[in-house]
Structures are given as structure tokens and as C-alpha cells.
């Protein structure tokens, strides 16, 4: 929403006065507890697209509202904590999305903190949720000290300039090819070699990208970044808008809450 101009601070639910759709947790209990207890719709425009975000409660005590709201969704964005991985409530919400054959886009969040190995997180998605992942971008760095991402589709590196703004504005970035001498120098030889090894492993052993499988909920495009610092957010937003299907008529099906 920061990129669409609907809010002026990443991680904040307080929007500009002119952006009435930018307020999410508006109830007093939500402000006090710092969680959503009811669903809300957030709307913003970006690059000729109008995006409607269905912001649903993540806490299991309010899961019924979340299940109902998912019936109106055309795509789902599954947020994974880089340190915690797949959590119990995530599994329940995934089951509902998978049952509806919703395209699921996965964003591994909080790379500004210590987290697990990206390959381990990919393996957990397959083992716990039964869905294969295709990394659209790949993080460059280690343990909360990430420098940028490698776009596997564009075959391009994007390095971010950390200005200590803590999400108050869009991060500046520098882009270049994998063999760009300036990019290699900025990364350092060790990080560059690690990135090349990761890319080779993904290309040799990873899944092929298939939009049919994505639309059937069998393959999830995978992204890495930090929503709080805007690390990797722009590339996710633009690729999501490119790949996500247009709204379609909905068919009614009965879904019981998973146990």
C-alpha cells in the first residue's frame, strides 16, 4: 500500500486522510491488542491495476470470519515468518485456499531479522503443506543481513540501500546483471559465490514454473523480503499483479472447518 500511495509508513495501519481504504485495524480492541479480530477491505491503485486486499484475522479465535472472507478471494498471499516457518493456523488457512484451488503466492517475511535457511523453508512448504514452491526471487545475504534479491525471471540482481528509514519511505535500489562487475564488487566475492551456487542448485533440482499448476493451487510462486523495511516488496507486488488471475465468477461449495 505504500507503493500505491495509500499509506505513508510501512507497517502502519494509519493512512492518509485522502485514502479512506487504508485503515485496517479500526476497532478499539484491535488497536489495543495489535491484532485483527474482524475482516476489512483495503483498496489501492498501482501501475494501472486496482487491488482489493481482504485483510483477515490471523488469530485462531476469529478464524470463522477468515474462512468466510476467503470465499470472496481470487488469489491468496501466504505470509511465512522467516524464523518460524509454517505455523498451525497457516496450515488451516492453506487447507481452505487449497480446497478452493486458489492461486497461492508465498512471501517469506521478516528477512530483516534472523531466520531459517531458505532451502529449509522451501522443503517445509512441500513436506507440511504438500505444495511445491518456485522461487521467483532469491535472497542475497545471511541471518538478517540481506543485501538484495536475485530475480530468476529477469535474471537480474537488485541491491537495496539501507538508509535506516525503517520503512518510512521506499528503499532505493541498484539493479544489474549477474555478471555486472559493479554488482559483484558491491556484494563481495563470498556472497556472490554463494548466490551463484544457490542459483545453480535451484535450476538443476527445483521445479519448473508452470502457471497452470499455480492457478490450480499446486505450485506457489515464492518471494523473499521484509514488509517492514520494504526489502523485496516492489518485486513481489509487480510480479503478483502480472501473474495473478483476473476476478472470475464464483461457484459455491461447502467447506467444513479443518480439525
Q: Model-found features: residue ranges?
A:
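P-loop NTPase switch module centered on the Walker A-proximal segment
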Residues: 1-80, 86, 135, 177-180
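P-loop NTPase catalytic nucleotide-binding module
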Residues: 83-252, 256
Amino acid at each position: 500500500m505504500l507503493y500505491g500511495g495509500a499509506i505513508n509508513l510501512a507497517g502502519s495501519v494509519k493512512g492518509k486522510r485522502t485514502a479512506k481504504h487504508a485503515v485496517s485495524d479500526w476497532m478499539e480492541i484491535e488497536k489495543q491488542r495489535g491484532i485483527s479480530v474482524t475482516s476489512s477491505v483495503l483498496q489501492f491503485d498501482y501501475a494501472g491495476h486496482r487491488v482489493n486486499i481482504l485483510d483477515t484475522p490471523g488469530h485462531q479465535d476469529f478464524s470463522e470470519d477468515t474462512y468466510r472472507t476467503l470465499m470472496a478471494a481470487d488469489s491468496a498471499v501466504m505470509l511465512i515468518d522467516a524464523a518460524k516457518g509454517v505455523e498451525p493456523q497457516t496450515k488451516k488457512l492453506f487447507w481452505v485456499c487449497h480446497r478452493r484451488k486458489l492461486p497461492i503466492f508465498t512471501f517469506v517475511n521478516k528477512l530483516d531479522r534472523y531466520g531459517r535457511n531458505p532451502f529449509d523453508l522451501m522443503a517445509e512448504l512441500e513436506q507440511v503443506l504438500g505444495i511445491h514452491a518456485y522461487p521467483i526471487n532469491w535472497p542475497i545475504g545471511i541471518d538478517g543481513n540481506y543485501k538484495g534479491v536475485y530475480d530468476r525471471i529477469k535474471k537480474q540482481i537488485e541491491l537495496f540501500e539501507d538508509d535506516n528509514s525503517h520503512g518510512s519511505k521506499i528503499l532505493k535500489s541498484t539493479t544489474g546483471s549477474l555478471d555486472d562487475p559493479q554488482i559483484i564488487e558491491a556484494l563481495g566475492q563470498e556472497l556472490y559465490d554463494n548466490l551463484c551456487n544457490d542459483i545453480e542448485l535451484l535450476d538443476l533440482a527445483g521445479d519448473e514454473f508452470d502457471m497452470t499448476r499455480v492457478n490450480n493451487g499446486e505450485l506457489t510462486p515464492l518471494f523473499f523480503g521484509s514488509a517492514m523495511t520494504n526489502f523485496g516488496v516492489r518485486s513481489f507486488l509487480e510480479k503478483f499483479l502480472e501473474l495473478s488471475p483476473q476476478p472470475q465468477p464464483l461457484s459455491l461449495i461447502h467447506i467444513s472447518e479443518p480439525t
